[in-house]
């Protein structure tokens, strides 16, 4: 959560996209609705990713990743792509909701450091 501490610098080119949001975009900015809707998104559903909690002010969230045979690597631990997809969806939406509807958030670059193999059900708290 280090990059949420303190002010967030947003380059001028990323500030406003000038698009009118659809009613769907306005509807999805409620944390409970987003949590239920993202649970039905096929890539995350197949990867075993589930958003289990998002705070009302979008400052905290919990994601679980269940390791299935189709999401495990040759050693039986969680495939790194499934772990990264769990973090990307939550961080991106939390930042977008905090910045407001006039902004779009895109993951331009990211890195992940694995400390130990993940097996069973993994929990990410942001």
Annotate each language-model stretch with its function.
Residues 93-125:
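Hydrophobic beta-strand-centered segment that forms part of the acyl-chain substrate-binding groove
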Residues 56, 70-72, 119:
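Generic "edge-of-domain/loop-turn" microfeature
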